[in-house]
Amino acid sequence: MTAHAPDPIHQFEVSRLIKISIGNMDLSFTNVSLFTVVTVVITAAFLFISSSSRGLVPTRMQSLSEMAYEFVASTLRESSGVQGMQFFPLVFSLFTFILVANFIGLFPYFYTVTSQIMITFSLAMVVILTVIGYGFYKHGISFLKLFVPSGVPVVVLPLVTMIEIISFLSRPISLSLRLFANMLAGHITLKVFAGFIVSMIGVGIVGVGGAVLPLIMTVAITALEFLVAFLQAYVFTVLTCMYLNDAIHPGH
């Protein structure tokens, strides 16, 4: 009997675990909700355990948490100066949440919540709304200088201003799509090659030899996906710091 390769899209299916309805609103607890909670719990537990150590020689967990702290702190200072450190709790929370969510999604039977566009878009909207809110709170109407670059000829200023506004409004879209698309594509590719292995083995003894190459590719892609998981959290964090700098220094 020939084995059928699993559907690579099935892993992203949202399934209802607990039905919750209020009027016409469906607020059911889904697998996405579950693994979002799992991600938060794992992240909080890791940070709590790593920060509770008081030894002179730091443990591995403590060293990892300190590396994450220094990365976010240095990125904020480089992009926004000392003033950017007021956003450290937000940026650090986003970085650790995305990093843990990306990593745990690589393990069997774990769901990758960052492969859902609504999750990534929600994270992006938190960033953009923070930028807008802080910008107007700190600078008032002067925050709009962000859309009026200095040194631009008056003739083309309306066009440039419109382009700047469109570019700003597209930030949450590009920020969310980048993370969503990379996690989605990587997991689909991994599942496709894993499906090749199942299909080849299902052919019989002859197919076992043909499954070697897909197996090698699966191992290589898995290693690559761990790198991508970190890089996507890194890129999201760096872009967040750059956007926050616009709120702190809108005229620069």
Curated annotation (Swiss-Prot):
Subunit composition and interactions: F-type ATPases have 2 components, CF(1) - the catalytic core - and CF(0) - the membrane proton channel. CF(1) has five subunits: alpha(3), beta(3), gamma(1), delta(1), epsilon(1). CF(0) has three main subunits: a(1), b(2) and c(9-12). The alpha and beta chains form an alternating ring which encloses part of the gamma chain. CF(1) is attached to CF(0) by a central stalk formed by the gamma and epsilon chains, while a peripheral stalk is formed by the delta and b chains.
Molecular function terms, GO-annotated: proton-transporting ATP synthase activity, rotational mechanism
Primary site of residence: membrane
Gene3D superfamilies: ATP synthase, F0 complex, subunit A
Taxonomic lineage from the root: Bacteria, Pseudomonadati, Pseudomonadota, Alphaproteobacteria, Hyphomicrobiales
Keywords in alphabetical order: ATP synthesis, Cell inner membrane, Cell membrane, CF(0), Hydrogen ion transport, Ion transport, Membrane, Transmembrane, Transmembrane helix, Transport
Family: Belongs to the ATPase A chain family.
Topology term for the membrane: Multi-pass membrane protein
Classification via PANTHER family: ATP SYNTHASE SUBUNIT A (PTHR11410:SF0)
Xref: PROSITE patterns: ATPASE_A (PS00449)
Domain of life: Bacteria
Compartments, as annotated in UniProt: Cell inner membrane
Organism: Bartonella tribocorum (strain CIP 105476 / IBS 506)
Record's protein name: ATP synthase subunit a
Function field: Key component of the proton channel; it plays a direct role in the translocation of protons across the membrane.
GO cellular component: plasma membrane; proton-transporting ATP synthase complex
Transmembrane segments: 29-49, 87-107, 117-137, 146-166, 196-216, 219-239
